[in-house]
Amino acid sequence: FLVGNTMIDTLVAFDKKIQQSNILETLKIKSKEFVLMTMHRPATVDHKDGLKQLFSIIELITKNHQLVFPIHPRTLHRIEEFGMKSLIAENRKLILTEPLDYLAFQKLISDCAYIVTDSGGIQEESTFRQIPCLTLRANTERPCTVDIGTNELVPFSQEKISDRIDAIVQNKYKKGIIPPLWDGQSTKRILEACMKFLSSESHVSTLLK
């Protein structure tokens, strides 16, 4: 049975509370005038050269936008370990926060100009919200977000990322669609499928054997 995406069910169910979040006021940012970043994978942050490249990308992004970066403990630990905390303080358009609660984070996804990430679930959430998402990875477990959604896989290269940022800023980025059945009703369809299966004659006869 094809039922949809239960993660989107959660997003739809809590959307009213998400939109009521005051995180934009707390961070003193305006809708569509900031970029959202998440970075935590070992391949990205566990070596000094990778972190240097990441800070170059941050400099690139903050030429045009403020950048909100809810930083993962792993990433912060590596920045401290490699003696790179000064690079954070030097960029006045970089807004570093602790990891945020679900409602606040989803509000940032909803209101950002675009996303730069190496994470997983945010690829689906951004596609549902129709927000451009640059995923700095070679592959993804969520291919439909690339095939028909707003997600793109981009090499961890300043030149490649700059090209895609320019496309977004110039409104030349691809126009994705929300995948079929991402409508907040997948849980209902799961229940209906289970009830149909449990009430079928073939299933009853199997249980009686």
Model-inferred region functions:
Residues 1-69, 75-209:
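Nucleotide-activated sugar donor-binding and catalytic core shared by glycosyltransferases
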